[in-house]
Amino acid sequence: MLIWLVELADHFQFFNLFRYITFRTGAALFTSALIVFLFGPAIISSLRIRQGKGQPIRADGPQTHFKKAGTPTMGGLMILAGIVGSALLWADLSSIYVVSTLLVTLGFGAIGFYDDYLKVTKQSDKGFSGKARLGIEFVIAAIAVFFMMQAAQSAGSAGSTFGSSVTFPFFKDLMLNLGYFFVLFGGFVIVGAGNAVNLTDGLDGLAIVPVMIASAAFGLIAYLAGNAVFANYLQIHFVPGTGELAVILGAVIGAGLGFLWFNAPPAAIFMGDTGSLALGGLIGTVAVATKHEIVMVIIGGLFVIETLSVIIQVFWFKRTGRRVFLMAPIHHHFEKKGWTESQVVIRFWIIAVILAMVGLSTLKLR
């Protein structure tokens, strides 16, 4: 919204700053962090009163988790307030990429909120029907992908199929045109990302820091892919308008820092599905917009590992009646092996940093 102040730059040189994505990204980070810091205590207090017993703890989980009973959930509301409030101030709301990303973020956040609500009111770890939840998520994601695909298509040359194509790291000219099936592919990527972060969110601070790391990596990718000069230099695909997504990702980092202040062990609040689904969906949407869906598998590799551990566990148990891991997702497996919660969290953070660096290295390896 404040980008409109650029029109005053002819009269006041200061307002020229609002033209620069880098300035607005930094401002968005600061603003979202401030929003969470200021309103976080009141939100936590309100949720604690309204929820009573707080988030239910899995009966088959590690014994150390039972001391967390009574901790309120739905902390994603704080994160969403920071992201959306900051985005409304600093992002270009005329950008279809910004609007699509906010649509997915708020849509997935609403689904997560309802899921959290059911879990708290029923005092059960069984919330929203899995199939219904995935179906609604996919519809929201598909709508966003369709509009982003059309935007990328119209920005290309006449007859271009770029908007509906999947690109590959290491190979600049290799593209696979999926046509309208790209909507299905992009929807799968976004829904997968949302639920992968959701599965990772099982320990204090475990999900939010890798989310911030992935956001920083994709903020850089969005800025570079949206800049013709940098995109040409790095030989990555130029996607006009996606640079604006760096502002949104700056807001994610700021909101994440604010949330981590309250989520640091012992957590005063949990993110809940409200936050994890929204944040994962946001990252997935940016990956689709910037044409870096495959690179997201590397940058968000920690989330992929967590998801695969659940898939393997369920598949193998149904097939043989035995478990591959002591408990899934895999972070609980290591807790059962004797790792302390802080050991699991910090070591997984390290893995997230390494994977983000590997993912970013693909930008130059062509």
Curated annotation (Swiss-Prot):
It comes from the Bacteria. One of its GO terms (molecular function) is metal ion binding. It is an enzyme of class 2 (transferase). Pathway: Cell wall biogenesis; peptidoglycan biosynthesis. One of its GO terms (cellular component) is plasma membrane. The chain crosses the membrane at residues 27-47, 71-91, 93-113, 134-154, 174-194, 205-225, 245-265, 268-288, 297-317, 343-363. It is found in: Cell inner membrane. It is a multi-pass membrane protein. PROSITE patterns: MRAY_1, MRAY_2. Pfam families: Glycos_transf_4, MraY_sig1. Keywords: Cell cycle, Cell division, Cell inner membrane, Cell membrane, Cell shape, Cell wall biogenesis/degradation, Magnesium, Membrane, Metal-binding, Peptidoglycan synthesis, Transferase, Transmembrane, Transmembrane helix. It catalyses: UDP-N-acetyl-alpha-D-muramoyl-L-alanyl-gamma-D-glutamyl-meso-2,6-diaminopimeloyl-D-alanyl-D-alanine + di-trans,octa-cis-undecaprenyl phosphate = di-trans,octa-cis-undecaprenyl diphospho-N-acetyl-alpha-D-muramoyl-L-alanyl-D-glutamyl-meso-2,6-diaminopimeloyl-D-alanyl-D-alanine + UMP. Its EC number is 2.7.8.13. CDD domains: GT_MraY. GO terms for biological process: cell division; cell wall organization; peptidoglycan biosynthetic process; regulation of cell shape. Its cofactor is Mg(2+). InterPro entries: Glycosyl_transferase_4 (IPR000715), PNAcMuramoyl-5peptid_Trfase (IPR003524), PNAcMuramoyl-5peptid_Trfase_CS (IPR018480). The keyword Transmembrane helix applies. Belongs to the glycosyltransferase 4 family. MraY subfamily. Catalyzes the initial step of the lipid cycle reactions in the biosynthesis of the cell wall peptidoglycan: transfers peptidoglycan precursor phospho-MurNAc-pentapeptide from UDP-MurNAc-pentapeptide onto the lipid carrier undecaprenyl phosphate, yielding undecaprenyl-pyrophosphoryl-MurNAc-pentapeptide, known as lipid I. This is Phospho-N-acetylmuramoyl-pentapeptide-transferase. It comes from Sinorhizobium fredii (strain NBRC 101917 / NGR234).
